[in-house]
Amino acid sequence: MNHIRLTMAQALVKFLDQQYVELDGREHKFVNNIFGVFGHGCVVGVGQALQQGGHHIRFLQGKNEQNMALAATAFAKQKDRLEIIPCVSSIGPGAMNMVTAAGCATANRIPLLLLPGDTFACRQPDPVLQQAEFFDSYGRTVTDAFRGVCHYFDRLERPEQLMTAALHAMRVLTDPADTGAVCLAMPQDVEGEAFDYPEAFFRKRVWHQDRRLITDGQLARALEILRAARHPMAILGGGVRYSQAGAEFAALCEKHQIPFGETQAGKGTLPFDLPMNMGGIGVTGGQAANRVAQQADVVLAVGTRLSDFTTSSKWLFGDNCKFITLNICPFDTIKMDAEPLLCDAKAGLDALDQGLEGYRSGWDEAALKATRQAWLNKVEEFYDDRRPQGLSQTRALGIINRFMQKSDIAMGAAGSLPGDMQRLWQSGDSGTYHMEYGFSNMGYETNGALGVKLAAPEREVYSFFGDGTYLMAHSELLTCVQENLRVHFCLFDNSGWGCIENLQNNQGCDTFGTVFRRRNPETGELDGPVLPVDFAANARSYGLLAFTIRTEEELLSALEAGRNQPLPVLYDIKVLPGSMTPGFDSWWRVGVAEVSEMERVQQAYQEQQNHIQSVREF
């Protein structure tokens, strides 16, 4: 066997350059880019390996470690998990900045490879710059924090350990059932240490994602339940998208008259105007899907984690409603006391469709149509919500939705906009709705937009977020300028955390700490004037084109101008506080105070206790 002498970092880059994923006979190169924020813990190791060349991986310069890792997460999500962008950081604070992004990727079942620098394996110069010492164990470093948010963690304390570590990292990253964040911590001395690696380690390696088929026993049990159902419903989760099973899902629902609701991750897989599409389901869902859910006697949940926002904290469905969960991940199949179908979504849906030949549900077709149309009428009311005081949030959203083309991508993650968008947004082509709502990570929108644009450079990308998110994290706006990427950043400025203020008020609390106001010297509280911020000026300082918008006319004019020039654009849209959509036929369990001197809080607690009497306990 022939060998080649390389540093560990050089070998890592060479290995990543030869990784491919195959799905349905089509190969996808798994790594074409790598993000990095260089520091002393990586610049002369991985940085040197990247600079030296001899590979086909492009370096992308992140501006903040968390934010570039969020961009990498969004990239992999938009690529249906068939390509990733690894992220390199220095040690200490640079490494720690990526922990949040790791949690985001793992919560959403998205592959993310993190390569943080670490302290010296030899320990000779300890304690080194940016090293935190732990008195209980010399072997512990801050990168151990990744263990709690990653599906695979390893620390490379010898250069030859790369071979087993890299293979196991790829095993997890390419496994649809077990994917999430992966961390390979790299002691900075080991990055530069050389080893005679076997050339076979660097051969082209194809990871095959063979579709897992449904077993005969599982299929028979599911068909027995479905055929006995009069009012079945389906839930379209993100797994349908990642399995590229939208056509099979639509065919099953249309053929057998099974209405369906969409999760945040599943929305946009199918057009909004399909007759069986009842829209968003759950806490941030709409009236149509939630009312159908309350009447359903069987629910077929496909590719969904069944989070509290989908099930309304397990309150939405009737006591006698049975669940069938079709999922590639065993962990998800037993939720809601379901009959499990452990298989690929496309393969499982096709088998169910064939097995249900001749079956059609007992739903009244006219009633379903009326329920759906009533909700569409409500959507139009929100989109046409004109107010003399200024722009409402839903009116601005509607203007942008109607302006965008079917191929344009809309994305978001946190605040009140995800609720508005799951309820109201009318998606175009498949894959044009990109919502991170597993972790609802503030900052994903502003930075993830970079990743989405890198994944789909031929499409226009519109990112939706509030002023709270922008203030928290927006460093990769500059990277969009650097990479000549036109991204449309739609900032809805309501002077605070409007979503949380709304929750606060709905649970009996007065507004407190959720609006951006000056400290009042007379009261000592944050109840002074609202803090005015010129976000457009801030964006211009980075090199973006930017508009300040207060009227419908200004918004339409800015949208037109934004599409006809090469720069990334920020639309600073001043919207009326509290002008988001309310909830519809749903409930969400939160930690309301059991004891309080505030009467409205006492009432909110009692209302919650009443709802708890109607929930499923598991």
Give the residues covered by each predicted segment.
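N-terminal alpha/beta PP-like core and its mobile active-site loop of ThDP/TPP-dependent enzymes
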Residues: 2-362, 399, 403-406, 486-489, ...
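Conserved structured core elements
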Residues: 6, 10, 28, 243, ...
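A short, structure-level motif marking secondary-structure boundaries and short turns
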Residues: 31-32, 85-87, 128, 207-208, ...
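Pocket-edge structural micro-motifs
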Residues: 61, 186, 262, 412-414, ...
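Thiamine diphosphate
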Residues: 123-136, 333-334, 342, 349-350, ...
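Short amphipathic alpha-helical interaction patches enriched in hydrophobic/aromatic residues
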Residues: 150-153, 379, 383, 546
